[in-house]
Amino acid sequence: MKKENILTSKATGMSVAELFQSQAIKNPRALAIINLNGDKYTYKVFLLRVLKLATVLIKKGIKHKDRIAILSENRLEYLELEMACAKIGAVVAAINWRLSDKEVNYCISLVKPKLTFLSEKFKTKAKLSTIKKISFIFYDSKYENLIKNAIPYAGASLGSGEDILVILFTSGTTGYPKGAKISHRAFIARAMYSAYEYKINKEDTFPAWAPMFHMASTDLAIGSLIIGSSVAFVDGFQPKVLKNLIQKYKLSWLVLMPGMLEGFIKFLNGKKFNIKGIKTMGAMADLIPMKQITEITTLLDTPYLNSFGSTETGMPPASGGIISKKVKNFSLSKIQSSFCEVILVNNNKVAELGTSGECAVRGPTLFSGYWKAESTNLKDFRNGWFHMGDMMKRNINGTLDFVDRKKYLIKSGGENIYPAEIERILLSHKNVSEAIVVKIKSKKWGESPIAIISIGNFLEKDVIIKKLKKLCRSSLAGYKQPVDILVINETDIPRSTTGKVQRHFVEDMLKTYFNLESFN
């Protein structure tokens, strides 16, 4: 590479650490972190801890592009590690502690970390000592002594734009998790997107309750420090703690996932509390009954985010839509975001208006491929676009409608059936809080759709099912009719960390829960 190209590359390849440090220099007394116990840290104090940890890592032999794994609940130290790695150009492998021991071991073995950070809560997880050539640092009093006695790192930031900062693990329907590589460039672009699209500024606080091994927290936790706002750590979804934060701080984005909204509404109903202000809340509106969105936007006097994104893309490509507060009827069509280009692909051609195609994306918020997965990367990034595996339709007004996952089709008698279409019909009934449609073997058709729902009143089960079958007959083509509608407790529905239903586990439940393997 020519010298001029090296110099221009350095000048334009800014790192997350440099932007965070810039905020600390400009606003040293500004609030950066509110920890689990309520302790507060200014940008100046938090930067000092980050620089001291950077020194600790270097003394442990960590170099540019080395991986460090972390297995911990949400806490200050999690973001501290991400920022220290951003400073020295190392990579954080954020391990999903909800995975099985076997899967956790797989993820750690895949990235081959030189060092692993463990909280007390996960010391015994996955028998990590069986993995060779791995050192540990535990979050205990010894860790605090390491930070206290270290000299702050005074060197230049070693990370740059296209360097990988965090590996987030995504779970598919089959096989082991894949490690999505998120660069400094992607995190910076995602922060700028949040500031632009949702008007997040330095006065806001992000309540990081979703696991930090997921983009729902890590993206905006890092983004908040880039923007100059603050992060409040919460160990999981705790309605009482979130209610207190709502009363004390102006919130940037209150993450709310499918499956938890009904309980949160019940908790808030009848309680008196002041709201400092929330810029936006929620996610994945099309997976939630409309009446719940109306209820929560009324309770919190806040609009709801009609999002469509992924670990690989960040909140773009289509999270530009906001559902106004307190409205009862609204569109769930997605609005394309400003920070990426989206095309819908069908048979290697751009799909015609109104026809479904796979969502393919380009833009600065994109990840840099999956760790050690060349064949998958070549396939998913074909023709210079990242193919998401989601089927969508573009409307005449430019909006996008989610159809379903490309990989989950029900093939019935030669016809393709997308579960989401049937689920939307079922969710339109006022008594249905959850609806999942999966495939079941059929002697006649090969596969048929079958529905599993959650309802508020089990005593009315038979009446509700009868009404739903009538609704399906009037709204869906004959071959799309669910062969049966089964009822289950909402708490028994298997979900991913984002709250999305895991259909392959629901299919297993047909056998274990309902003793069904096929339908005539």
Where are the language model's segments positioned?
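Conserved AMP-binding/adenylate-forming
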Residues: 229, 281, 288-307, 311-399, ...
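Conserved AMP-binding A3 loop
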Residues: 42-44, 165-189
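Conserved AMP-binding/adenylation subdomain of ANL enzymes
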Residues: 188-205, 213-253, 267-268, 337
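AMP-binding/adenylate-forming catalytic core of the ANL superfamily
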Residues: 99, 116-118, 363, 368-369, ...
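Conserved structural elements of the adenylate-forming
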Residues: 47-55, 180-201, 213, 261-262
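Conserved pre-ATP/AMP-binding loop-to-beta segment of ANL
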Residues: 28-29, 151-169, 176, 199-205
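Conserved AMP-binding/adenylate-forming core of the ANL superfamily
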Residues: 12-13, 29-75, 79-83, 100-105, ...
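AMP-binding/adenylate-forming catalytic domain of the ANL superfamily
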Residues: 477-498, 517-520
